[in-house]
Structures are given as C-alpha cells and as structure tokens.
Amino acid sequence: MKILSNPPRPISSRYLGGSRLQVWRRTRTDVHDDEVHRLSDRSRKIIHITKMCILLLLWFACTFIVFVFAAEEKPRSTMVTVMPNKTVFRKVDLPNGVVRISLLGPVDWYLMRFPEEDNGEYGAGLRVECVNSDLNVSYHRSDMWNIVMNSDSTAYLEVSRNFILHEGSGGDRQAVISLESKQDSPVSLHMLINTNPLITNMCVLYAGLLILGLYMLIIFDVIDHTFAALIIATTAIAILGLLEHRPNVHTIISHVNFESLMLLFGLMTIVDIMATTGVFEYLVVWTYRISRGRPWPLIFFLSMLTAFLSAFLNSDNMALVLTPITIRLCEEMSLRTAYVLVIMAIFADMGGALTPMGNPPNAIVTTNPAVVAEGVDFVNFVIHMLPGVLVAMFVVFGIVYVTHRKSIFVLDQHQLDLMKEREGEKAPPSQETQDRIAQLKDKEPGRYWLKPAENYPETLAGLEEGNRIRDKPLLIKCCIALSFAFLCMILHSIPKVADGATLGWVVLLAAFLLIILDDKSDLNATLEIIQWTILLFIAALFVLSEAVDQLGFFEWIGDRTVMFLTSLEPQHQTAVTTMLLLWTTALLTVFIDNAAVTIFMLKFSFQMASKDDIPLPPMFWALTFGACFGGNGSLFGAVSNEIIALIALQHGYKISFWHFFVIGFPLMLVTMVIGSAYLLIAHSVLSWN
C-alpha cells in the first residue's frame, strides 16, 4: 500500500440528516467547497447580491406579464365541406397580415411534407386572397397549397402552413380563405384558423436565450437545478404571453409526459421499500464473498451487480442504496474509495442504458406517445440495447483494470486518517462473529475457486454481522410486485395482449401492489423518501421544451440540418443523422444533466423525422445511447453521479469534477465509439429499424 507524498487537505465528514430526498436538494456547491472558500467574503457578497437582483428582476417581469396578459384564446375552428369541382370561401380578419391554417382530416401527411414524391394528384387546393365584397375580383392571392388526400378515409392527421397577405382588408376589400376541390368526391376537413401566429425569426432568438440561460444556471450552479428549470419554464411562458400566445393551465399540464413521471415515481417507491429489507447491503456483501476478498474480482462483481440492478431498478435509486455499503467495503479492503465510487457510477450509467426504466432519459424516450407508436416496448428496447451495452461494459472494465491496476491501492493520508478513526470506533466482535470467523478459517482451502485474501474470514464475518436481510416477508412481497411488473411488460410486447399495460401504468400499479402488501397504516413515511425534486425538475423541462418548440427553435434547427443532409447521398442520410444525434447528445450531457438534454433532443428528433425521409427508430436508439453513455463524461452528466459524490462527501470522501472527468471522459469516448459502431452496423448495414 502506497501513501501519496502530497495528500489533499482533509475534508471533514458531515452527517446529512433527514430522508434521502435531501441528497438531491443539496447543490453541487457542496462538492466544490474548496473553490468557493477561495473567494473573498466581499466577492461572494457581490455575487450573491447580483444573483438576487437578477432573480428578483426576472420574478417581477414574469409576475407583471402573468397579471397583464391573459391566456390566449383558442384558434377559430370550422368544418369545411367542398363538393366536387367547387370552391368554398371563409372570411377572415388579418390584423397582422399573417394567418396560420391547420387542416385536420384524411390528409396524406407524408406526401405533403415531401411534395417531390407525389404524383400530382391533389384532393383540394387552399389559398388566402384579398377580394372585393362580391368575391369576383381578386386583388392579391397567395400561392396555392395543394392538399394530398389520404387513401384511408378514416385517417385523422394534421398539416399546417403560414400565409402572408401583403394587402389586408379595408374599404371594399376583404381577406378570405378559399378551399377548392380537385377531385370527383366531396372533401371534408376540419380547419383551425390562427390570425396571430408566432413569427419565427425573433422567436428562435428568444428560445435560444432560454436554453442558454438554463444551461448557464445549471453548469455554474447559480441556483438549485429544480428551481432553475422552474424559473426558466416560467420565463418561457411569460415570453409566450408577451407574444400573445400565453397557454392556459390546462395546456401547460398537457405538455408534461405523466407516463414517464409515473414510471419514475413507481420505481422510487418500490426501491425505497426494498431498501428497508437490507437486500442491497446483503448483495454487496455477497460480491465480497464470491470474490474471496480479492480486490479486482470484487470490483468486477460489484460493477456488474451495480449495472444489473441499475437496469431494472433505476441507476439513481441504486446510487442511493449501494454507495454507503460500498464505501465501507473499500475501507475494509484498503481500496482507494473515490476511484471505486467513480467506477461504480460509470457502470450504473451503462447498466441503466439497457432497459426503459434504467434511468430518466430512457423513461422519457420510451414513454413518449410517438415512440410507443413506433412499436418500442420493453422487450424491443432491451433487444436493441443489449449488444451495445454488453460490449461497452466489458471493454470499459478491461480499460479500467489496465489503467488503474495499481493506483486503486494508492491511498492518500486523508483516507488513512478516516480509516484509522473508524477503526477505533468499532466495537469488539461479538461471539457470533468470532464463531463465524472460526467457521470460515476451518473451511478447506481447496473448496474455494479463488484463493481468499489474507483477512478474508475476519472481514466477511464483520460485514455479514451488520448487513443481513432484516425483513424476509417484506422482501418476498417486493419480489411479487416486481414479478408482476416485468410479467406485464413482457405481455405488453406481445401483439393484442395487454395493449394498455404501458410502462408508466405497470410500474405505478406494481408500487400500489407493494404498498397494499406492506400493509402500513402510515403512508407518510413512504412518501417522504420519494425524490420529488427530480420529478418536478423533469416536469418543468417538459413545459420548457414545449414552449421552446412553440417558439420555432426545433423547426429552425431542423431546417438547417435538413439543408446539410440534402447535400449528402440519400443512402448516407440516416447514418449521418444518427451519428449527429448520438454525439451531440453525449457532448451536451458532459455539461448538463442527461434528462434535460434528452427532452430537448427528442423534440429535435421529431423535427428531423418530419422534414426528411429518415426513420425514427435509429434516432431513438442514438438518443438513448448518447444520453446514457454521455452521462459518464462528467460529474454533472447524470443525477446518479451527483448522488454518489454527495453521499461520498457525507462519509468524508470528495469526488471533484476534475477527478470524475479524468476517469469518466476518456471512458465515455470509448463507449461512444462502441455505440457508434454498433448503430452503424445495426441500422445502416443491416437496416434493423
């Protein structure tokens, strides 16, 4: 065992009282106490006052707008039926000279998006024109918008277009919408008329500033992450209000994907109840037992256990329940605790990539209605992700072993002092522990598949004493609830069997089943351990992303991306789009939480699919690989990383941003190369869409 010649300044261990909810409430400032204390008191005071003034100014502006600007009225709606070879007129007032018309009905959405592929046969044509009061003289008219009708008369799709009329109504002139039939059968369409649509140019700038503001607040940790998302989402609504498009409360709530929140809430409930049984501590001790106390076999089994549990019980939850016992295990074996915890965080992120419930990004993607409509379910998701995740995990562990084979045993003076302090606090072993030690020593060495470490009997007996399964009946109930959930997910993957058993509902009902079986009269204890701020953070991001979408940001980005893609050969467009989405998501995740990146990039994926002939599924897989593997790039990439760092800080171990980055970022690049190769082979070579 080596001692570093220049050990870092000691960090005192602090107790974090209350429920586990407080782990997320703590900001990343706690992780950077050293940097904060280097600032003078005067500088910190100036920064604090400046921050308060900006936030108060923002609050005042939002409050004023909310009070002054009422929620927008719904667009004018009308049902239009046109007989064969006839034209129908609808009068419209155009105060701003622009109107957005949406048509709902049996329209061919694809051919209207890509008119170069149609055969010139249109069902109707629509234009906006300025005419006289007798409707027989046209002073100005827009270009004809040709409507391609769907061969399926029961289809109900929506297409939209903005029209600008340079000459408005007045005097003998009036603006009308003309719908002309071009087929031998009647045409019936539901028409929505919005005479005050958003103009894209300035709106895109506002949207860009909103996203930049959110990134700055989170990256520089100006305020709590959840509050940052809430205040920026509120600002987005205020901007829409200034533009006379403020949504009402019902519309705002409809922007939230409650299916993903139900999934995360249910998993949090199940895992926190399971944690009271002691099963997670028992499993960590089990990894020590099967590794016979040998350091690298232990790290391998612990990494695989973390990845497996993260896949099915969520990486954030596993970070909460596995970190404390892992710290104790590292101290018992004299391993460099911070290194082991970073490795654990990396495998939690990679394991979480395997299933829809493995981490928040996967939950956000797989519960989206458009993704579900593409046939993405539990079994389908696991089958697509499994090869890439397995290869990445084994390659990463090999690299970790080669690069940190010796450094994992190099302890700094601070860890030595902590270990010495806690060694002195230990109580003498009980008689039961002594008997267990004697039993382990008497076991024939030949019965071990791996030669035990020198202090293996004493360490194992000490770990077993305080880390047993405390409530076996409750553990059985937890297994029943989980079995119900996974059975329903598998059945949902079979066509026409349990079609309504979506991920969110299944996990939520499994949580309710566990609460019923647990039979506790007081539900407060269960609700207190739910990480409500994570759920609120994600809900605020849903609202913000929808507001940014309404401001035209994703459409603007999509148009420019399509301009680039059209310069490529058609057979290369899917591959380039997939790689672009994969690496952009991963690199953004280095600086901001992967859940936030996922919500924005998912919107971008839909825009790309609507503007170019690119299948959606490859973009879903690219997004999930990029968000999950990209979370390994830095301490801020995933919530689970921060949770591990904060729990480590409780126990006296500091994992700095730089410490995590040095280990995690190169490994992230390796996993991204693996993910890129896998996606190119699967979707470009094999066309596995």
Question: What is the role of each PLM region?
Answer:
Residues 208-209, 227-231, 261-262, 296-304, ...:
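Hydrophobic alpha-helical transmembrane segments
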Residues 214-234, 406-409, 472-476, 483-508, ...:
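Flexible hinge motifs at transmembrane-helix junctions and intramembrane kinks/re-entrant loops
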Residues 216-222, 305-314, 345-357, 582-597, ...:
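Transmembrane alpha-helix interface/packing and boundary motifs in multi-pass membrane proteins
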Residues 2-79, 170-185, 335-338, 342, ...:
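Juxtamembrane and boundary regions of transmembrane helices in multi-pass small-molecule transporters
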Residues 197-209, 256-269, 311, 315-319, ...:
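Structural signature of hydrophobic alpha-helical transmembrane segments
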Residues 65-196:
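Beta-strand-enriched, solvent-exposed domains that form extended recognition/catalytic surfaces
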Residues 42-50, 195-202, 220-226, 249-260, ...:
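Interfacial loop-to-helix junctions that mark the boundaries of transmembrane helices
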Residues 246-338, 534-612, 617:
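Membrane-embedded alpha-helical segments and adjacent helix-loop junctions characteristic
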